Amino acid sequence: MTTTGEPRASFFSLTPDRVLDAVEVGGLRCTGRCLPLRAFENRVYEVELDDGKRVVVKFHRPGRWSREAILDEHAFLAELAAAELPVVPPLDLGTGSTLGEIDGILYTAFPKVRGRILDELDPEQRRRLGRTIGRMHAVGAARGAPHRPRLDVARYIHQPLEVLLGGGFVPEGLAPRYRDVALRIAGAVALPLAATPAQRIHGDLHPGNVLWGAEGPILVDFDDFLMGPPVQDLWLLARGDSEEARRGRADLLEGYEVFREFDRATLALCEPLRALRIVFMSAWIARRWDDPSFPPAFPMFRHANYWMQEYEELIRIADALTP
């Protein structure tokens, strides 16, 4: 279904009726039960169908991804599912497509899956997750994603700095130092990152995007999938340089290398990638600050203490990179 309407305004004012209209456009029928789920970037709802099944409908934030970029994600999920990876591919909406449009907003429906988020994993769970990631990367390396970005310093440092400094989010007295340390990190990591082969990866594989069910891990939420180094999908699961983090990475890699070789030299990118994520995520909040749901969710974002703590963390990373 394609209708007229200003997409951004429609996105902020989605109603249950419009959600149900979107689900039913291809012939599916709903009971009327529609539950909003916690999500910041997109609007996500759980909808009950007449047959008792439940689907999760994601309305993509206008301007975030193009139609082609979302279909790149859907294609990757379809390939992973065909290779029997534990992922949740999108449903055909009954129109012959996995991507719909209503009021100018693109949307996708997924079958609901059940699982738990585990904050701590035992060694065997880490090895099992590592095997799953290795299999995912083996599929991801088979081809590219022409409409998805590459993980690089332009996207993760330079463009975010324009948003943060140009929008006045970093306090005036701190802004020059914040810019300098971010650029220092960018300068240290640009060439090593560019020299590392990029392939299709999840991109945001933190513990909250891994559900654990009876059959093991299920990888969910590929919204940030992009072209990048495989190590990006590992460091978020075992952050830092503590003994515990090192053991976690060792377990993940033990499982990973059952299915695929891993370039261990790229582990040196873990801390630089963490720095890139810090700057990128702050710019993400800044870009969404006019969304009514963001200020209450991030109340410290406009406080000087938030930025000083972030600056000090970036300094620690930069000093370790460029002593």
Label the model's feature ranges.
Residues 230-261, 277-293:
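Active-site activation/catalytic loop segments of kinase-like enzymes and analogous catalytic loops
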Residues 62, 115, 217, 225-227, ...:
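Activation segment
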Residues 1-92, 213-214, 321-323:
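Conserved NTP-binding catalytic cores of kinases and kinase-like/nucleotidyltransferase enzymes
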Residues 41-57, 90-91, 186-234:
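Active-site acidic catalytic loop and adjacent metal/ATP-binding pocket
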Residues 119-176, 196-198, 298:
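A cross-family kinase active-site recognition segment
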Residues 4-7, 163, 168, 283-323:
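ATP/Mg2+ or Mg2+-diphosphate-binding catalytic cores
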Residues 262-274:
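All-alpha amphipathic helical-bundle segments outside canonical DNA-binding/catalytic cores
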